[in-house]
Amino acid sequence: MRVPYSWLCEVVTVGAPDWDVSASDLKQTLVRIGHEIEEMITVGPVDGPLTVGRVTDIEELTGFKKPIRACVVDVGDGQQHEIICGATNFVVGDLVVVAFPGTTLPDGFAIAACETYGRHSAGMICSAAELRLSTDHSGILVLPPGTALPGADGADVLGLDDVVFRLAITPDRGYCMSVRGLAREIACAYDLAFVDPASDQAVPPLPVGGQAWPVTVQPETGVRRCALRPVTGIDFAAVSPWWLQRRLLLSGIRAISPAVDVTNYVMLELGHPLHAHDRNRITGGFTVRFARPGETIVTIDGIERQLDPVDVLIVDNVTTAAIGGVMGAASTEVRSDSTDVLLEAAVWDPARVSHTQRRLHLPSEAARRYERAVDPAISVAALDRCAMLLADIAGGTVSETLTDWRGSPPRADWSLPPIRIAVDLPDRIAGVVYNQGATTKRLTQIGAVVVDTVSSEGHTLTVTPPSWRPDLLQPSDLVEEVLRLEGLEVIRSVRPLAPAGRGLTAVQKRYRAIGKVLAQSGYVEILPTPFLPADVFDLWGLPADDPRRTTTRVLNPLESNRPQLATTLLPALLEALVSNVSRGIIDVALFAIAQVVEPTEWTGGIGSIPVDRRLTDAEIALLDASLPRQPQHVAAVLAGLREPRGPWGPGRLAEASDAFEAVRIIARVSGVDVFFRAVQYLPWHPGRCAEVFVGETPIGHAGQLHPAVIERAGLPKGICAIELDLAAMPIVEGLPAPQVSPFPAVLQDVSLVVSTQVPAQEVQDAIRDGAGELLEDIQLFDVFTGSQIGEDCKSLTFALRFRAPDRTLTEDDASAARDAAVRHAAERVGATLRT
């Protein structure tokens, strides 16, 4: 938002005539009370002669690629000065501003007489942008008739001794998007009396005699107030005076016509947007309603726009007059032949205005104010101020009729709910002892009504926020206002004492250990996005009842196509994999450790959460019940070569066994034993996927991904992945050091023939269970299929290591344990000993 320093000073000094502060000091004060000033722009200065002139003749020069005009300008010295100019937005008789040779413009450009386009040019006709009055480069600056006489000092006429502040107004401080709001802030900061420019003192109420225009409002539209007043008999050919045009230019708005200019001016002054309709183009009364499916509107920029049923419209009996709070329609736009206007001041729903203007890509100064909330108490004052300005500038008569729709039933006042606050709460929160009465003083300054109460419960204040401060909802908001206006610099910076170190928790230790061991195994960690692409589960082909489809939707997502919080880490890992592969990095191993969000069945509502006291146990339990479950997962993906090619061989592609090994190293560092069971679970390959168990508790899945899923993702074949729920894995603290037997081991091999449908893991588990405690380790080292084995069969060869903790094993001891393992495998999985 841009606002001139001179305009702020004018409004502030109404209540404090002796107040005088420089622009730089005012900037520091605004920053001190919490406003972000992005830039302080100096208007001008111009060094050298800058003169008002009147154009007396224009000759169009031909033979050039762009319009060139030889202009004769009278500057009151009795001479005719020829100046070459490329702008075409002025005519003979217009007042312009001329810079003569020897003048240096604000950007450092020096004016000199020169020969150009075959003619002599004795200076330059200036644009508003060249004088830093605005950023509009579309043409030269044309002054309204009667602004000054030719020969007048241009710097004095234009007011080139001003400063413009460019502020970034936060969403909760919509009241500051006006001179009214900022002037009040300045008065608070300097402890000045303040006269509200929207008060009856500043805007005397106009007479009211009857309804101006019938209006019907659908209650669901969220409109809080709608005021209408006609102004008849205006002269559309009139031009807004320079003082008004100047303030619009400095605020970043181009002057268009009196009807449009005064609505923009009052919006900047009071913060309440208005709209001017051509009354003679309105048929019947106004209705405020939602758009109908398929409905369109041609807005004042001449573009036909497709509406949505959530858009709010103003319509008459025939056509649409405006998109509420966003833009007017061409059908009721004021034009060059308009004589009667109907001024409208409405208070639209902030959320609906924000949604509509973003969807239609129609950002506007009005919409920026509506989406931050507009003061409904000043709608009629803004309307009357606008009507009187329009009548003064363009003639005409302000009608005594007024429509003021205030809701159904009509609302008598616009006060906000009162807030109770302990008088010393700001002191306790800031750790500062403020002067007695500081809290009451500061809250009164911002416009609140404060009632002081002393009772058995203590000294409290009942604070009713003003109608323009809907952001004040709870005691902490009031505390912020007191601290802000008293000065944050008085709050001491005290370094908090760190508690004695207690070390990492068991969960944190496991987190670090897993990350470390995966990194040592060649995996690279990424930070996964917490949001899911909307169509990812459809691409995976998950059934409709899959739990992973039950997601938590974010109301205001960072990206519209990612509205859901992730229930799995795999989509983010696969996206990272795609990004790497698309850049030619095809041998990749990635992992992530992060939380996923699993919604609960909670359907209750949560009210406002107090921040000025400790929550009760019941409130904490309610919050806990409403929160979705957020377990920590670890996931990894592998693509390309797991073992690189080189002089030693061609390398080895990643396969399902690498995924299983990743699970084992995670289990090993976590101090748990895992086993695998074959399962069908998308997005994994149905024949190359295993469910991972700790005891009888499933903790995740591992294996090779489904070829169709890989193809849809644009990845090469053979991608492997794991995902484990660490919250389901028991925490093992203080892992004991493994006992090392001093006795030698006995090594034996065993080959078993089983059906090809039997997973090797089940055979291995059967051998381990059957061999007993003497079996120290088992490794599968060979898989063989062929006619010698039999159809639909495979041979699995395991290396067995036997060792006793208290004696030296004999070959007979080891053979007996091996035979027991073979018998157990035969009973459990139908294995036979290969001979």
Swiss-Prot record:
Gene3D superfamilies: 3.30.56.10, Bira Bifunctional Protein, Domain 2, Ferrodoxin-fold anticodon-binding domain, Nucleic acid-binding proteins, Phenylalanyl-trna Synthetase, Chain B, domain 3. HAMAP family: Phe_tRNA_synth_beta1. Disulfide bonds: none annotated. NCBIfam families: pheT_bact. Binds 2 magnesium ions per tetramer. It is found in: Cytoplasm. This is Phenylalanine--tRNA ligase beta subunit. It holds the Pfam family B5. One of its GO terms (biological process) is phenylalanyl-tRNA aminoacylation. Tetramer of two alpha and two beta subunits. Residues 414-493 form the B5 domain. It comes from Mycobacterium leprae (strain TN). It is an enzyme of class 6 (ligase). Its EC number is 6.1.1.20. Residues 741-834 form the FDX-ACB domain. GO terms for cellular component: phenylalanine-tRNA ligase complex. Residues 44-158 form the tRNA-binding domain. It catalyses: tRNA(Phe) + L-phenylalanine + ATP = L-phenylalanyl-tRNA(Phe) + AMP + diphosphate + H(+). CDD domains: PheRS_beta_core, tRNA_bind_bactPheRS. Mg(2+) binds at residues 471, 477, 480-481.
